[in-house]
Amino acid sequence: MIRLIAAIDTSRGIATDKGIPWKLPGDTAYFENETTTGLIVMGWATYNEFSAPLHGRDNYVLTRDQSPLRSGFLPMTTLADLKSQPHQDVWVIGGAFLFAEAIVRADELFLTQVLEDFHCTKFFPDYHTGFVRFAQGNDQEENGVQYRFEKWRRITEPQDDPHT
């Protein structure tokens, strides 16, 4: 199963040029708990934000760059490589370019809905026409920011993108 996991604001924003504009320890704990099984796939910019791989998971970086990755990270040249991992859950963790590419293959979305607009410059793709919400948590607040956890399931079959 391919899952995208992200925190998005009311405009589907995920980050500004300076990074993620909210600090939500509860969301970080949720992310760590949900992604402990399976493997992680991240884009180059997200990889550069990590000083070390996420513990206990295979950490793949989607890149066409042939430069060696830091210890604990594995290269993936195309999302089609996910087909070679059919027995594992796959967690796509960003960034914006990778989310846009991977959403056509996604079975589920695990979204933290940040209930305010942070005027982001990087965005999660539109998902409302292809997915239906099947779980929603209660509203929470940390550091003056309200948010809630939602899970969405695809209502049509995932597509194989011929461009990846």
Functional labels for PLM-detected ranges:
Residues M1-T164:
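Enzymes that bind and transform nitrogen-containing heteroaromatic metabolites
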